[in-house]
């Protein structure tokens, strides 16, 4: 089982593949000589972010000469490195790295566009003076339309000039043009010849591309493919290491050897290659020439989707496998909610339908609201009427009936209005959401709906209202419905109204005492004012009882409103999760 560094917390796949990013001299209390050539791209990225120049240079080297572009990208942020413009002006290899990186990271395109606008003339000038690396970079800028118009013929012209000077980057990219017939006539033999020329410079990228050409040509030449993959793998090219492992695992053109397969997969996985992690996890799951270890398999799969910041086919494969592990409780505590989340994210509808079935039940008939003969036809009018009555009383108390005003009365009315307004907002949010749906339901005779009840931080939740089952999928939907449930509390409103009635009764007793004193003092004018105040208190009491009755009735009507709008929420859910219903 892998361990984690006591200092930085990162996974230590092996002592040779870890350098602590918090302590430059120690790994778990042991003094280590730092060797940037053998630490992972993730760790290099963290160090580079702290402007460790050696780490930055190693990242550039791996992008140029190996296949770092297929590895973890989460910590590689050259835009934050110091003096990148000056470095790019002085170093065409660094410019190549920035071009390579920018192409795969659209999120930085605005910043990089400005950067390359500055660099374009510098690259063009250097290319014209015969700098083979600048010629290659200029070709790439024309090919991708970076700081200039796209022009594939100019791209080929400058990359050919670079290749003519035996520049290995120019050679392999010109080979790609011929391999795919991009701007030139398709010519696999020409592509192979160019790659062999680059391979003679011990260039692992060229060796890998040669291996791929021989592997996928018609007919394939597996022996030559293995030869070139082996050469690249020996230079730490992770994708080549993966293919060497596949050769040994399948026994294609070499003797089947699971130990060697595990060895090469471990090397590639240690660098962060997702495909290798998934294949290695499979071997641990099945116990193929390694001790069966579900926990190890889970760690590998989990790191492939959460640790590397990529989003590709292999992420979806890993998510599907992880979902099955969560569903069965293999290597991790059983969690159906998490399994559903991963199945949905991986777009694996086949497995989703083992848990859910699609329903056609909807509610499309609008409700009619009849609350104490108010002739209201919809819930919006009822809400407006309740809000109006509450605000009417608050304004009267504050500006016209100041003699019976009391903070407890005002605060209770304000609390009722705030709680009711909050409930209205939640109703509107809910009916415009994809929560509380019934277009999906749990398969019958399964324990899934019961399992989700016991899940902390659930992604899926199951509710029953008025004998109708609803499902929520997604953290935001669950949070919304939980908040709605919390505010949909008749007892909360009842308690506030009890406080309000108590405050009004206290004010009524106070006025009765005032009236007795006024009678004793024979103060007729004051007596009339107090009688008027008592009438106002009775009016407020009668109105609050009516509002209370309407609010209790509103809660019941609200549930009917949610029921009648289920079809709208179903449609919204189907739009958000179109792949489940086969719409995309």
UniProtKB/Swiss-Prot annotation:
Domain of life: Viruses
Pfam families found in the cross-reference section: Sel1 (PF08238)
UniProt-listed SMART domains: SEL1
Signal sequence region: none
Disulphide connectivity of cysteines: none
Gene3D superfamilies: Tetratricopeptide repeat domain
Alphabetized UniProt keyword annotations: Repeat
Keyword Protein biosynthesis: no
Residues in Sel1-like repeats: 132-167, 168-203, 204-237, 238-273, 274-309, 316-351
Record flagged with keyword Transport: no
UniProt cross-references to InterPro entries, sorted A to Z: Mitotic_Regulator, Sel1-like, TPR-like_helical_dom_sf
Protein name: Putative sel1-like repeat-containing protein L18
